[in-house]
Amino acid sequence: MKKTNMALALLVAFSVTGCANTDIFSGDVYSASQAKEARSITYGTIVSVRPVKIQADNQGVVGTLGGGALGGIAGSTIGGGRGQAIAAVVGAIGGAIAGSKIEEKMSQVNGAELVIKKDDGQEIVVVQKADSSFCSLVAEFVFVGGGSSLNVSVL
């Protein structure tokens, strides 16, 4: 019974950590505040593309707490008496560390650093979620939406 409950708890905890919305880093996704907003358009050419990782902003709370709780439960099933309490503490600490690292990895997105030479000669760098159309587009024209947050799309 304990093994079934622990397996179910692990499944729930680690499936929740994968719920980070990584589409917000895509060039095709706009925030609610950007909807119905006039944005300037600038044309340019992709000069280079470099693969990068984008780390979503998260505090690691779900992974740390979930991992700590599950590690504590798993540790408490070991031994008896004082040894059981020590195993529970060690399990909780180990689980918290592991849960935090798992959540961190699950909230990373493959991105692309795009160096773009605008038609006016100025060069800018934009980082957004990787798109397969950027991989082979060095020297192709692109559309750049203006403002403090840019979205790059291939024409």
Swiss-Prot record:
Keywords: Cell outer membrane, Lipoprotein, Membrane, Palmitate, Signal. A lipid is attached at C19 (S-diacylglycerol cysteine). One of its GO terms (cellular component) is cell outer membrane. It is a lipid-anchor. Residues 1-18 form the signal peptide. InterPro entries: Bact_OM_lipoprot/Surf_antigen, Gly_zipper_2TM_dom. A lipid is attached at C19 (N-palmitoyl cysteine). It is found in: Cell outer membrane. It comes from the Bacteria. Belongs to the Pcp/SlyB lipoprotein family. This is Outer membrane lipoprotein pcp.
